[in-house]
From Swiss-Prot:
GO cellular component terms, semicolon-separated: extracellular region
Classification via InterPro entries: Calycin, Lipocalin, Lipocln_cytosolic_FA-bd_dom, Maj_urinary
Coiled-coil spans in chain: none
Family under the similarity heading: Belongs to the calycin superfamily. Lipocalin family.
Name the UniProt record assigns to this protein: Epididymal-specific lipocalin-9
GO molecular function: small molecule binding
Keywords, comma-separated and alphabetical: Disulfide bond, Glycoprotein, Secreted, Signal, Transport
Top-level taxon: Eukaryota
Signal peptide interval: 1-16
């Protein structure tokens, strides 16, 4: 009987160990997303805006939760062939994981999914001159994410009407990546 209890405990602990990186899709602990991130993939329904020199091709390097619940993003983007560093604050809204910012129009930024330790997926809706653009971005804590996270990102893109032709692998694309 004791042997069965010990075996059950060992199996429970082993199962818990494999679920350390469970995806979170709501009720985010925003303090846990603070830190360094690397852009892995980006997708949009307007490819011009995320292609080289596109105004929405942003390489987040660091995220910081501010005291008021807003997020500070330190990122880079290409401007006339040069990698330029910029800091931007996305203001929190009444919804957990939702933020707003004025950049190249009006933007709603949603944290879609994260496990805090490996990856994070953001959705941004930009409205510029009456035109709506969707952008999704996959970031990792390390420079290269595994294929599992990339497949999950592709599945989420599909939910927003974007297929594999709308996704750019950013790990091999720009000077701003490193």
């Amino acid at each position: 009987m004791v042997l069965l209890l010990v075996l059950g405990l060992v199996l429970s602990l082993a199962t818990a160990q494999f679920n350390l990186h469970t995806a979170v899709r709501r009720d985010y602990n925003l303090a846990r997303i603070s830190g360094t991130w690397y852009l892995d993939s980006i997708a949009s329904d307007n490819m011009t805006r995320i292609e080289e020199n596109g105004d929405l091709r942003l390489f987040i390097r660091n995220i910081k939760l501010l005291n008021n619940g807003s997020l500070q993003f330190d990122f880079h983007f290409m401007l006339q062939g040069e990698c330029v560093a910029v800091t931007m604050v996305c203001e929190k809204t009444k919804n957990n994981g939702e933020f707003s910012v004025a950049y190249e129009g009006k933007n709603k930024v949603l944290l879609l999914e994260t496990d805090y330790s490996m990856y994070i997926i953001f959705y941004m809706q930009n409205i510029k001159n009456g035109t709506k653009t969707q952008v999704l971005a996959l970031y990792g804590r390390s420079i290269l994410l595994d294929k599992t996270h990339q497949r999950e990102f592709e599945n989420i893109c599909n939910l927003y009407g974007l297929d594999s032709q709308n996704i750019i692998d950013m790990t091999k694309k720009d000077f701003c990546f490193l």
